[in-house]
Amino acid sequence: MLTLEELKAEVKADRIDTVVAAFPDMLGRLMGKRFEANFFVDGAFEETHGCNYLLAVDVDMEPVPGYKAASWEKGYGDFVIKPDLATIRLCPWVPKTALVLCDLLDHHDHSPIPHAPRNILKRQLERLSAMKMKAYFASELEFYVFDQSFKEAHAGGYRTLTTPSHLNEDYNIL
C-alpha cells in the first residue's frame, strides 16, 4: 500500500507514470480510468466521473434493459468515481502503474450509489459491526481455458467453446 504522499514521491521519481482508478462492476470486473500520474496526483485524486451505464451492462458492455437506475428510457447520466486513497498500491503486472480502488457516488448529492458493489459490501460490513461481528474474506479464483480467442468466442455467441482437454482438470497437480 502507498499513501498519497508516497505515490507523489514515486511519480516525481518517475517510477510511476500511470494511475488506474477502478471500481468493481456488477460482474466483478474492474472498470474505471487510467490517468497520467502527474495529472492524478495534481488533483484527479479528489474525484472523477463516469457514465452510470457501467453498472447496467452485460459481459459485452451492452446495456441491459430493466435497470431502475440507468436505462435507455430513463437516460444515462454520470456518477462520481471517488478514489479511496487508503487502497493505493502498485500494480505489479503493469510496469510503472499504481491502482486505487474507488467508490461510486451520486453525481448530484455525492451520496453512495446503493447498488454499487463496494457500497453494498460497506453496508453489510456496517451491519456486521453493529452486531459485534467481523467478516473475513478470501478470493477463490476459478476460470476455464478455451481453445478459442476472445474474438472467436464473441463471434460464436460464447456457444460451443472447446477446452484443451477432455477432462475436468480442477485440482489436478500434473
Task: Show where each model-derived region lies.
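Glycine-rich, acidic/polar active-site loops that bind/position phosphate-bearing ligands
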Residues: 1-174
